[in-house]
Amino acid sequence: MFCYDSPEYVKDMGTPDRYVAVCRDYREGKVSGKNLKNKQKAIFLDRDGTLNKYVGFLRNIEQFELIPGIEEAICKINESGYLAIVVTNQPVIARGEVSLEELEEIHNKMETLLGLKGAYVDAIYYCPHHPHKGYEGERPEYKIECKCRKPKPGMLLKAAEDFNIDLSQSWMVGDGENDILAGIAAGCQTALVGSNEHFGETSNFVSLEEFVNKML
């Protein structure tokens, strides 16, 4: 069995109510708008401190806990026509503290928790690298200078290529300077959440929930 995972418009319309909803979406242009032949808009989301509670280096799946209100915020992004795409630095891979399989389990938990409230992310991009070498237990193949680790824009640029995204019509939302710098480098609008810092024209919000309520 094969599965084609797509952010395009796919809905079961096997009941009268669902059929009516699909017809409405078709009339409103939502079906054609989600076709990847057309330019897409995205909200790029940092993970730690933006979606889940910040605990420093998250090494254990039991440490993963969504910030209250995140499910509702992601639902609003899903309904808005924007793609919801996670872009996260995960140096715990390079440090040898979390395996790729364990990271996948953490992200599976995140998607399951979101799904319980009807929310979803369209894609997850992560950078496993870290430039500093010489630590016990590290994985040398990931101890490199890369193009994907924020504040570099590599993950956003890759997503833009994969999903035909217009970066100038998209947002980078995160809780730290590296998120904002990556968004600026990619040509996105930027929003800082949960921080008292200020970066030029970057908009500040208490949380992702406040961002979507005010900007979408």
Language-model segments: which ranges?
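Conserved alpha/beta core of the MobA/IspD/sugar-nucleotide pyrophosphorylase nucleotidyltransferase superfamily
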Residues: 1-38
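Generic beta-sheet signal
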Residues: 4, 87, 127, 173, ...
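Active-site neighborhood of HAD-like aspartate-dependent phosphohydrolases
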Residues: 39-84
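Active-site flanking residues adjacent to catalytic metal/cofactor-binding acidic residues
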Residues: 45-47, 88, 174-175
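Metal-dependent phosphoesterase signature
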Residues: 52-68, 93-101, 116-117, 139-147
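Substrate-recognition element of Asp-dependent hydrolases with the DxDx(T/V) motif
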Residues: 70, 74-110, 120-133, 183
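Asp-based, Mg2+/Mn2+-dependent phosphohydrolase catalytic module
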Residues: 101-122, 132-134, 139-172, 176-216
